[in-house]
């Protein structure tokens, strides 16, 4: 569960390392976001010589959460970190690589490009 002020790691090669969520999209007073939801973030930490600068406002899709993801078959899934992938206005990832596994719910939500770039879909 991601909410305002939550800090997330960035799981792609755009150059951003950490972002802070300041808006959960999808409703007038929506409080929490989970895997597959879009959030608006501020970049807090970047790698040197990256195209994204500290303080930039970006949209991102959540790909991993520490909170359990409950599935229809009764199983649950949990990751070690809260992570996201930075996207453009059309919903395509800005980076060309994605690091670490992602949840299957990403593909179900329509982010096929992100799931195809990931090394492992759980």
Curated annotation (Swiss-Prot):
Disulfide bonds: none
A GO term, aspect molecular function: large ribosomal subunit rRNA binding
Transmembrane intervals: none
Superkingdom of origin organism: Bacteria
Matches recorded under Gene3D superfamilies: Ribosomal protein L14
Keywords: Ribonucleoprotein, Ribosomal protein, RNA-binding, rRNA-binding
Gene Ontology biological-process entries: translation
Signal peptide feature range: none
This protein's GO CC annotations: cytosolic large ribosomal subunit
Record's subunit section: Part of the 50S ribosomal subunit. Forms a cluster with proteins L3 and L19. In the 70S ribosome, L14 and L19 interact and together make contacts with the 16S rRNA in bridges B5 and B8.
PANTHER family associated with the record: 50S/60S RIBOSOMAL PROTEIN L14/L23, LARGE RIBOSOMAL SUBUNIT PROTEIN UL14M
Family of this protein: Belongs to the universal ribosomal protein uL14 family.
Physiological role: Binds to 23S rRNA. Forms part of two intersubunit bridges in the 70S ribosome.
Entry protein name: Large ribosomal subunit protein uL14
Species, as recorded: Chlamydia felis (strain Fe/C-56) (Chlamydophila felis)
Organism ancestry: Bacteria, Pseudomonadati, Chlamydiota, Chlamydiia, Chlamydiales
GN (gene name): rplN
